Amino acid sequence: MSDRFELYLTCPKGLEGLLAEEANQLGLTEVREHTSAIRGSADMETAYRLCLWSRLANRVLLVLKRFSMKNADDLYDGVHAVDWAEHLEADGTLAVEFSGHGSGIDNTHFGALKVKDAIVDKLRSREGLRPSVDKLDPDLRVHLRLDRGEAILSLDLSGHSLHQRGYRLQQGAAPLKENLAAAVLIRAGWPRIAAEGGALADPMCGVGTFLVEAAMIAADIAPNLKRERWGFSAWLGHVPALWRKLHDEAQARAQAGLAKPPLWIRGYEADPRLIQPGRNNVERAGLGDWVKIYQGEVASFEPRPDQNQKGLVISNPPYGERLGDEASLLYLYQNLGERLRQACMGWEAAVFTGAPELGKRMGIRSHKQYAFWNGALPCKLLLFKVQPDQFVTGERRQAAVEEGEPRRQAPVASEPARLSEGAQMFANRLQKNFKQLGKWARREQVDCYRVYDADMPEYALAVDLYQDWVHVQEYAAPRSVDPDKAQVRLLDALAAIPQALGIDPQRVVLKRRERQSGTRQYERQATEGRFQEVTEGGVKLLVNLTDYLDTGLFLDHRPMRMRIQREAVGKRFLNLFCYTATATVHAAKGGARSTTSVDLSKTYLDWARRNLSLNGFSERNRLEQSDVMAWLQNNQESFDLIFIDPPTFSNSKRMEGVFDVQRDHVELLDLAMARLAPGGVLYFSNNFRKFQLDEHLSTRYAVEEISAQTLDPDFARNNRIHRAWQLRLR
C-alpha cells in the first residue's frame, strides 16, 4: 500500500469549514470541502491522529479506490479488483454501507449486496473461506459512495461515528450530538476564552453535553481517547505500534491538562430527572473536578465564578418540541436575555437555536451569527457581547407610572367633554382614591390595583388599573333600578374615567358582571388575544383585559399570593383550581421545591404555562388538567403548602356532576387535608359572599380565619370581597 492516502471525513451539514480548519491543523493536506464532508491527503499517522483528535468529524474514511461505473456489473468488477486479502482475514467479519444512487443502482440495499458479494467472492476464490456479515461490530466496515457515475470505495477507520465519545450513555429528550456541541463551542470562541482562564456556564444544560465538551477542550483531552474499539482494530493494514505511540501522547496530554487548576464550568437544569444522568455523564468523562451540575431555573440563573472571572454563557434553549407553546418559548428567550443583562455583564454569550427569530426577544443585539444544521433542522448560532451598548432598549417596554410622574393622556383633537354633575362627583371620588392608593402602589411596586369599588351606590362599578389600561366591571343593577337611568350613569362614568385618571379613552375596557352560573366564568367575551405583561411582588404575569370576564389575575388575592411566596421556600406546593397559576408563579419565585397546579380548563393551563415561562420557570412545575375532586381522590402525594381558591359554582362538561362551594367544601377540604404533610399549611379562600364554613371542620383540623390579613388597601373598602382560612393538621 502507498505511504499516503486519500481521506474522506464526514460531518454534520454546516461544519465543513470548521472541520477543514481542524483537519488541516492535525496534518491533513490538499483539503477540499464538500457537502457534509471534506477530503484531503494524509499518511497513516495523520489518519490515526484525526480519529483520535477530531472533535467535529463523524467518520474518517480511507479511500481504497475510485472508479467509473455504468451499471451493477461495473460496481461488482470494480470492488472485486481490490486485493481484499490485504485488508481482511478470509474468515473475518464484514459490514457494508452504501450511499447514493444512479448507474442502475436505485436501491442502496441492492448496492450494498453487490459490494459484499464482490468482496466475499474475491476472498473465497483465493482462500477457500468467506467472511461473514456482522452489521453491529465487524472487523472491517466498508463504505461505497456513488456520486454522478463515480464510485468511491473506502474503509471506515472510525467504526462507530466519532460523535459517540462514550461518556453520554444517558441523555434527555432533545440531545445535541457531541461533535455539533463542540463545533458550537469553537464558533463561540471557547478555546480562546478557556486559554485566558475564563469561565463557562450553561443555564439549560440538559445532560451536560456542552459542559463535557468544553472541559475536554480546556483540558486538552482528545475527544476519543477512551474509545476501545475502532474501525481499524482488526484491519490488516493497521500499525499497532504507531497507534500506541499516538495514544500514549494523547494520554500524557490529558493527564497534564487535568493536573492544571480546573476552570469554573457549571451547568444548571430545571428538570430534576436530568440532574443525575448529567452528573453520571460528567463522571464517565473523568471530569468530576472540572464540571458541576446543579438544579436551577433560568429565572435564578446567576453565574458566580470563584475568582469573579468572566467567560462564556452557552445555551441550546428549546425551540419547538420541548415546550410546544410558541408563547412560552418567546417568554423563555425573553427571560434568558433578561438574566444575561442583569447577572452576566461583561460576559460573552452564545445561543444555539432552531428559532432564531426568538433570539430577537432577548433584548441584546447579536454581533455575529453562524448557520448550522441540527440533523434536518436549520439552526443558527447567535453570539452576543453582554454589555450595555449592545442592549436593545424599548423592546417590550410598556408605559409605567414612576413616582411623581403623572399618567399622560393621549393627545385628543378637542377638549374633553364637559362632565355632568353626577359624573364630576364620580370623577372627584376616583381622583381622590387614585391619589391615595397611588402612593401605596408605588411604594409596594404594584402595577395593578382597584381604584374604585362601588364607593358611590349609584355608580355600581369596579374600576381596576392595569398600568396604563383601565378595566371596568359594571355590576348588574337590581330590577328595582330603572335600566335607562343605569345606562346614563354608566355612560357618565365612562366619560369621567379617562379624565380622572389621565388615560387614553381607547384603553378603557368595559365588562358587565352578573351572578356567576355554570361555566360563564370561563366563557370567552372577545377574541382579540391581546396579552399584557404586569408585575407583582417581583414576578411577571400576563393579563388579558378583553377576551374573558376575568383578566387572569384576581387582584383581591394579591396578599395571599405574596404570603405564599414568603412561605414557599423548600416546600412542595399544590395549587387547586389554579386558574392561570399566578399563585404558583409566586411559589416558584419564593423557592418552592416543587409545584403542582390543577385545573380543568386547558385554556387557563396554557395561560399558566406562559406565566411560568415568562418568569423563567420550566415544565418541572407540573400543570395537571383534571377535575380537582377526582384528582384528589386518585392522588397519593404529600404537599407542604396547599392553596385552594375554588369557583362558587361550576358545571363544566369535562367534570362529573356539579361543583357547589357551599355544599362541597367539606369533602374538598377533607380530600386536600389528606394530602397535607405533617407541619404543612392549607389556605382556603373563596368569593361567595354568603359562604359559611362548616363548623365541624374545626373539630378535625386547626382552623383560623385570616380574611382580614388577606386584604390590601385597595380592597379595604370591601371587606366581603373574599374570605380566607388557614388549616393545619391537629
Swiss-Prot record:
EC number(s) for this protein? 2.1.1.173, 2.1.1.264
Please state where this protein is localized: Cytoplasm
Q: Which gene encodes it?
A: rlmL
Q: What class of enzyme is it?
A: transferase
| SUPFAM superfamilies in UniProt | S-adenosyl-L-methionine-dependent methyltransferases (SSF53335)
Q: Which family does it belong to?
A: Belongs to the methyltransferase superfamily. RlmKL family.
Mind telling me which Pfam families this protein's record contains? Methyltrans_SAM (PF10672), RlmL_1st (PF22020), THUMP (PF02926), UPF0020 (PF01170)
Annotated Gene Ontology cellular component terms: cytoplasm
Q: What is this protein called?
A: Ribosomal RNA large subunit methyltransferase K/L
Task: Identify the residues that the record assigns to the THUMP domain, covering every copy.
Answer: 46-157
Whether Protease counts among this entry's keywords is no
Q: Which InterPro entries match?
A: 23SrRNA_methyltr_KL, DNA_methylase_N6_adenine_CS, RlmKL-like_Mtase, RlmL_1st, SAM-dep_methyl-trfase, SAM-dependent_MTases_sf, THUMP_dom
Q: Which UniProt keyword terms apply here?
A: Cytoplasm, Methyltransferase, RNA-binding, rRNA processing, S-adenosyl-L-methionine, Transferase
> Which reactions are catalysed by this chain?
guanosine(2445) in 23S rRNA + S-adenosyl-L-methionine = N(2)-methylguanosine(2445) in 23S rRNA + S-adenosyl-L-homocysteine + H(+); guanosine(2069) in 23S rRNA + S-adenosyl-L-methionine = N(2)-methylguanosine(2069) in 23S rRNA + S-adenosyl-L-homocysteine + H(+)
UniProt keyword annotation of Transmembrane helix present: no
Question: From start to end residue, where is composition biased (Basic and acidic residues)?
Answer: 399-408
Residue span of region Disordered = 399-418
GO MF terms listed in the record are:
23S rRNA (guanine(2445)-N(2))-methyltransferase activity; RNA binding; rRNA (guanine-N7-)-methyltransferase activity
- Note the HAMAP family from the entry: 23SrRNA_methyltr_KL
Explain the purpose of this protein: Specifically methylates the guanine in position 2445 (m2G2445) and the guanine in position 2069 (m7G2069) of 23S rRNA.
Species this chain originates from: Pseudomonas entomophila (strain L48)
Q: Which SMART domains match?
A: THUMP
